Amino acid sequence: MNYLVLSNSIRAAVVTWGKSLSVDLAPFGITVNSIITGFIDTEHLAHLNEQKSNNMNIPVSEILEGIKKSIPSNRLGKPSEMGQLATFLASDKASYITGTAIPIDGGFLRSI
């Protein structure tokens, strides 16, 4: 994602750290997973879009449409969708899922 240099830089490190931590904690029945978020409809994203709008001198609505067009599902994610995934991963139903990174991005990521 553009305009998120620091965030983008640490993402890979956090995912790798989570994987290593999951190996160390699995014998104790503790799971560790990462949620890789795409464009989620939050105040933070709105703020970033406003900054980009000011920098590029184009309407926020145009920026938002461009973002949506880049996502195969053609929409932003909802915070509740991210919360539901986190809730599932923290539940007993996900007790055998550990050391993984799960994208919640409407199909935005083009890699595995």
Q: Over which residues does each language-model region extend?
A:
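Active-site loop immediately N-terminal to the catalytic Tyr-X3-Lys motif
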Residues: 1-5, 27-28, 74, 92
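Active-site helix of classical SDR
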Residues: 10-11, 18
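Short C-terminal tail/terminal secondary-structure segment
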Residues: 87, 98-112
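A conserved structural motif in NAD(P)-dependent oxidoreductases
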Residues: 56-59, 71-82, 93
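Conserved SDR Rossmann-fold cofactor-binding beta-strand/turn motif
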Residues: 31-41, 90, 103-105
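Short, small/polar-rich loop/turn modules that mediate ligand/substrate recognition or access, typified
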Residues: 26, 31, 97-99
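Short, flexible catalytic-loop segment of classical short-chain dehydrogenase/reductase
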Residues: 37-47, 51
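Short-chain dehydrogenase/reductase
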Residues: 18-19, 83-86, 90
